[in-house]
């Protein structure tokens, strides 16, 4: 599952740029501190309902902003750990730091 972490990614795709400008995306990306997190940990970090965080995580994975760092089985349930694909995402008009 290991993916290469990049220092910086420049986003030129309009759709990805729009996603990066959303407040929830900024909060999700800012909650990482050098360690991958589960969906529950992300939700707790940003005080967001766990049931709703999955939609946003799925969207960020589909747009190569987050990736699944690892998977493990905990009490019979597959638990995934997520991590940003870069430390800094740059759009033509702003930078978003993780």
Walk through the language-model features, giving the residues of each.
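Short coil turns linking two alpha-helices in DNA-binding domains
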Residues: 49-51
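Short, cationic-aromatic polyanion-contact patches
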Residues: 11-24, 38, 70-93
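Short capping segments at the starts of secondary-structure elements
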Residues: 34-41
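Glycine-centered, phosphate/nucleic-acid-interacting loop/turn motifs that mediate DNA/RNA or nucleotide
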Residues: 64
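A short acidic, leucine-rich amphipathic alpha-helix
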Residues: 41-47, 60
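Pre-recognition alpha-helix immediately N-terminal to the DNA-recognition helix
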Residues: 26-30
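Long, low-complexity, charged/polar intrinsically disordered regions in eukaryotic proteins
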Residues: 1-14
């Amino acid at each position: 599952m290991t993916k290469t972490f990049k220092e910086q990614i420049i986003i030129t795709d309009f759709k990805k740029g729009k996603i990066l400008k959303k407040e929830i995306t900024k909060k999700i990306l800012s909650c990482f501190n050098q360690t991958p997190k589960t969906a529950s940990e992300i939700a707790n970090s940003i005080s967001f309902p766990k049931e709703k965080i999955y939609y946003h995580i799925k969207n960020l994975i589909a747009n190569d902003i987050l990736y699944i760092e690892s998977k493990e089985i905990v009490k019979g349930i597959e638990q995934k750990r997520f991590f940003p694909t870069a430390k800094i995402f740059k759009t033509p008009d702003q930078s978003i730091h993780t």
